[in-house]
Amino acid sequence: MSVGKSSLKRAPGEAPGPSFDLTRFMPYRLAVLADDVSATIAQVYVDRFDLTRDQWRILAWLGNHAEMQAKEVGRNAGLDKMQMSRALARLDEKKLVAIKPDAQDRRGNILQLTKQGRALYDKITPLVTAREDYLLAALTPDEAAALDTIIAKLRRQALTLKAHG
């Protein structure tokens, strides 16, 4: 019996056909790993600094740029318009990000860290990179380099598949 819709229709007591082991399915394993890694990193900025993941991503992008277009930050951070809007509103309330109209695009905004935002970014960055270092310490230097290569290859392949449906 092939795996598919027909395999879902079995007589009572009939043994299942070939099984699909979700725990061995690479996308599932990557998602679980990403959740675990993100949760350990998030402990720093959520618990200690009352930031959400989306807020941290915005701060992290702005931390490496003097200023950026809001839509570019959102695209780079993987945030949709609603996520970006909510996170920016809170960062603005906390006076961590300055928002000004984009002179080139009247519909857009330019973002930059405030002094408080820069100070917070400077506090958080060494803490999250220390956690990253701890996680990567489980790998040899060759394994870490291979992981970077594998991630890049899988990302390119996924984007190609996504583009072609």
Give the ranges of each region predicted by the language model.
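N-terminal leader segment of winged-helix/HTH proteins
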Residues: 1-49
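Positions in alpha-helical segments
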Residues: 28, 57, 130-134
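Flexible interhelical turns and helix-capping residues at alpha-helix boundaries
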Residues: 30, 34, 38, 49, ...
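Short amphipathic alpha-helical elements of helix-turn-helix/winged-helix folds
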Residues: 61-65, 150, 157
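A short alpha/beta connector and helix-capping loop motif
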Residues: 157-163
